[in-house]
Regions:
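Acidic, glycine-rich active-site loops and adjacent beta-strand->loop/helix elements
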Residues: 126-128, 164-170, 210, 239
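Bacterial Sec-dependent N-terminal signal peptides
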Residues: 1-26
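Intrinsic-disorder/low-complexity accessory segments
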Residues: 22-131, 135-159, 206-207, 214, ...
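Core alpha/beta catalytic barrel or barrel-like domain that forms the active/cofactor pocket
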Residues: 188-210, 232-250, 273, 469
Length: 912
């Protein structure tokens, strides 16, 4: 062979080998079916192997593991972009970080916006029964790696795509469950035996400002610290009946703290997504008032990104591996602004939903490609706007401030015209002086920063709060010495959070109250429910003590590195005179330390009759000093954040405690409230058993347990016999049969009553406080009115408080409320409120634990008709035979976020 021929042969061989090397295995070659085929789902094990395989076969992809899941699986993220960009990933990541954190000058930002690549996050599978999510992710990944059309190549050149699995554990559970039946037509997603996220189930999409769960933590690190994408896209199911998919833009109200560029960015991307579907003759996209989804709530995977200057997209699409139908909804057939291209009733296949999802992904990626530099610069601009606002006097508008302007104006009219003068015909143009009276009044100004003093009783919980901020990219500073701000002295080791940083909206949202507007279907009509909570201020939920700083300030402050969590060590000081140690009941970590001590066989006592001037609260714990306890205490203080007070004298009034045998109610399929409570108990070292309704019906409970915890949803209403609410469970595997059933008035309640009478204690939370009515205790519903001589519940037009923070007064002299402040913030979601029989209170049969002391208990959120709450009892304890029932109307363990009220559960979990 001649030299020239040899050259061309070798060149051809290289081309062929390159083509072979870049051959991307199709989904069918790997899974044995096409993505979207009827009756077919991929497991996580199969999906993980496929992503590894295609990443190895393509120079467009990099497979990474972002952390472990709660069940120990690898959670992966595949980074997709052009081969040239893959070589410079760290450079582009740094550009994205610099622009996202916005701590650079305008000219540098403009230059980096030209140099950088748009970063787009696309996830799937968060809610594992919403099976389109992870399967569209598989198909999208394949197409991005295998297609060579002009659009795909341009996208790969301009965009870095973070393709992320949001819930590996859930996919493995759900897909195996669906595929277990060999008869395809019998396959079903129904009757899943447990939660598809170990602790939270569907609530895994409510964890993104608290970040309790490992999956949430993994995702947050990539979103808020590592990559800071300009767009994130969160796939869900399902849209409203009569549509195919619901998406951006979303209905009002949107949250007032984030930048308006978020809203207009959602408008632009929503238009791009709708246009793509319409151009491809894919009808059925609805937005705005066409669905219930809004941008008010913080804490969802999508919504938390708004408070970090990212354009967060959600679509909710129909579709199931089992063929389904689009029903006839006549109200959706006429085109309007929300649904310009309605879909007609028809049969619907899984593959159609996959195709729609891929089109939507491409619409987003095409937008990012064509608007790359604008997206990069706008995230910088939003961050810079936040920094600028934090550096100067700023007033944020809110409904209550508008109400204050209107009130002042109306008061002025009354003074001028007289009290009987109607203002109905007055001009809607309010004089500007009333705006100035509010929006130039320093009382209404935004804070420049927040100080979290290190000398607060539960500093460890405050540090947990700060770590939640740090996990989302917020910068926290630590005082290296004592300092004084606005005339108040603060100790060293206090923490400072300034608002002059890019993620200022998130800071304000977690420190300040949410001011939800009064939102009604029409004047005088029923309220429009918020999509999730109306108020959630995390600092309030966690009981964190902090001070607002209203002017520019500085001090001996040291910045913590971005994303590095704070570590708080416990302490103990031993001396020859030490007789024992006290763990303050005001600190949550004290209960964890007590549980460790009890597990080691060390005697622990509770201290009663503590004076108000004491360094610790009534109900705190005492441990006598000896060689064993000294070693244990020192070890616990090193490994945990518990503070041991060394005592030179043994307290005089002590009650010995012991470990209680704890039972926690759950049901077949899993209760999210029970799942979160499991998480809490495990975090604080409480041993427990799960009990199902059949276990309760069997009886003999007192021989096995000392305390039964019944979270919301366990107890049926007194107007219901209970026992309903389950699908046909005849074909479930035998190992789950013992979990079926519901608590009933006929079988279960009598066994619970016997348990109480024999000396057991029961803790009820939320709707499960209905047990008090089943037991005919001397309490009644406070949220009622008398109409025509008949008692009936207050209508929603008169009283409506969706998920919000309210303030209650607490009797912390009771052992059940040890460690609580006299004024406590609670999470309240139209929960039960009680009236006590005065004679029963006098006789000590029932004792109020917490109550609404005034007619304005709202702290954050929305409480229409809150005046009705005044004097209502939020929590009580009642003697039943030898035992006690503890009834907590508010959600004291809410999503493992309400750490300020955890003690109301913990106090009841000992024999004492």
């Amino acid at each position: 062979m001649g030299t020239k021929k040899l050259f061309y042969f070798l060149l051809l061989l290289c081309i062929v080998n390159s083509a072979i090397a870049q051959k991307i295995p199709t989904p069918k070659e790997h899974f044995g079916f096409n993505i979207g085929d009827n009756y077919q789902l991929a497991t996580f094990t199969q999906t993980e192997a496929y992503f590894k395989k295609i990443a190895a076969a393509s120079d467009r992809a990099k497979y990474t593991v972002i952390g472990k899941t709660e069940e120990g699986r690898d959670q992966f993220m595949m980074i997709v972009t052009s081969p040239e960009n893959q070589k410079k990933l760290e450079q582009y990541k740094l550009i994205s970080q610099k622009l996202g954190n916005a701590d650079i000058g305008i000219e540098e930002a403009k230059q980096l916006s030209k140099e950088g690549k748009a970063v787009v996050w696309i996830d799937g599978g968060l809610h594992a029964t919403e099976t389109v999510g992870i399967h569209q992710l598989i198909e999208t990944a394949y197409q991005l790696l295998s297609r060579n059309d002009d659009e795909t190549m341009r996208i790969l050149n301009d965009v870095i795509i973070l393709i992320t699995h949001a819930n590996p554990d859930g996919q493995e559970l759900v897909s195996n469950w669906y595929m277990r039946d060999t008869a395809k037509e019998k396959r079903s997603l129904s009757n899943l035996p447990r939660l598809y996220e170990k602790y939270a189930g569907h609530d895994n999409n409510r964890d993104f400002y608290m970040l309790n769960l490992k999956e949430s933590q993994n995702i947050a690190r990539q979103l808020f610290i590592e990559w800071i994408p300009q767009i994130m896209y969160n796939h869900h199911q399902a849209g409203p009946a009569g549509s195919v998919v619901a998406g951006a833009p979303y209905r009002d109200p949107f949250n007032f703290v984030f930048d308006p560029l978020i809203i207009t960015g959602l408008d632009a991307l929503g238009a791009a997504m709708q246009n793509r579907l319409n151009a491809e003759n894919k009808p059925g996209y609805t937005s705005k008032s066409g669905s219930t989804f809004s941008t008010w709530y913080n804490g969802g995977l999508r919504t938390t990104t708004y408070f970090h200057n990212m354009i967060g997209l959600l679509t909710e699409i129909i579709g199931n591996p089992t063929p389904s139908d689009i029903p006839l909804v006549t109200a959706r057939l006429i085109p309007n602004a929300a649904t310009p291209n309605p879909v007609l009733p028809q049969k619907w296949l899984f593959k159609q939903s996959i195709d729609y999802s891929v089109s939507l992904n491409y619409a987003v990626l095409n937008y990012a490609s064509r608007n790359r530099d604008e997206l990069l610069y706008n995230i910088y601009l939003m961050g810079k706007n936040s920094i600028d606002k934090g550096n100067k006097d700023t007033w944020s508008l809110s409904p209550s401030k508008i109400e204050e302007m209107n009130r002042m104006y109306q008061d002025s009219l009354k003074r001028i015209k007289g009290n009987n003068e109607s203002s109905r015909n007055q001009s809607t143009n309010v004089p500007v002086k009333f705006y100035d009276s509010v929006m130039k009044n320093k009382v209404y100004k935004d804070a420049r920063g927040y100080i979290i003093p290190s000398d607060q009783p539960d500093f460890a919980t405050a540090v947990d709060f700060l770590n939640a901020l740090i996990k989302t990219g917020v910068v926290v500073q630590k005082a290296t010495a004592d300092f004084t701000i606005a005339g108040k002295k603060y100790p060293a080791n206090s923490y400072i959070v300034k608002t002059n940083q890019a993620f200022r909206p998130h800071i304000l949202d977690l420190f300040e109250p949410q001011d939800h507007p009064n939102d009604f279907q029409y004047p005088g009509g029923p309220p429009v429910p918020p999509y999730d909570a109306a108020g959630w201020t995390l600092a309030y939920q966690m009981g964190v003590q902090f001070d607002r700083v209203m002017e520019a300030f500085d001090g001996p402050f040291e910045k913590s590195p971005i994303g590095v969590l704070l570590k708080l060590n416990g302490s103990v000081v031993n001396s020859a005179s030490t007789k024992g140690y006290v763990l303050d009941a005001r600190a949550n970590q004290s209960f964890k330390a007590v549980n460790i001590l009890l597990n080691e066989g060390i005697e622990v006592y509770r201290i009663t009759n503590v004076s108000n001037s004491s360094l610790y609260a009534s109900g705190s714990f005492f441990i006598s000093k000896n060689a064993k306890t000294k070693t244990a205490v020192e070890k616990i203080s090193k490994e945990n954040s518990a503070e041991f007070l060394a005592m030179s004298e043994k307290p005089s009034s002590l009650i010995k405690i012991s470990k209680a045998r704890i039972a926690l109610w759950d049901i077949y399929g899993g209760s999210m409230a029970s799942g979160w409570t499991r998480w809490i108990l495990e975090q604080f070292n409480y041993a427990y058993d799960i009990v199902y309704p059949k276990d309760i019906d069997t009886g003999n409970l007192r021989s096995k347990y000392d305390v039964i915890v019944l979270v919301g949803g366990a107890i049926p209403s007194v107007n219901s016999r209970g026992g309903g609410g389950e699908n046909n469970l005849s074909n479930i595997p035998v190992e789950y049969k013992n979990r079926t059933g519901r608590i009933t008035a006929d079988k279960s309640i009598p066994q619970l009553k016997i348990f109480l009478e024999q000396g057991g204690n029961i803790v009820t939370i939320g709707s499960s406080t209905q047990l008090a009515y089943h037991l005919k205790l001397p309490v009644t519903d406070a949220m009622v009115e008398i109409e025509n001589g008949v008692e009936k519940p207050l209508s929603r037009e008169k009283f409506y408080t969706p998920g919000s923070i309210l303030r209650v007064t607490t009797d912390n002299s009771l052992l059940s409320a040890s460690g609580m402040n006299t004024e406590t913030d609670v999470y309240f979601d139209n929960n039960p409120v009680f009236k006590m029989n005065p004679d029963a209170v006098t006789k000590g049969i029932v004792k109020p634990i917490a109550w609404f002391a005034n007619d304005k208990p709202l702290r954050s959120g929305w409480a229409w008709g809150q005046v009705y709450l005044k004097n209502g009892v939020a929590a009580f304890e009642a003697t039943v035979g030898k035992g006690k029932l503890f009834a907590f109307g508010p959600e004291i363990t809410f999503r493992a976020q309400a750490q300020g009220t955890f003690k109301l559960l913990f106090n009841q979990l000992y024999n004492q």
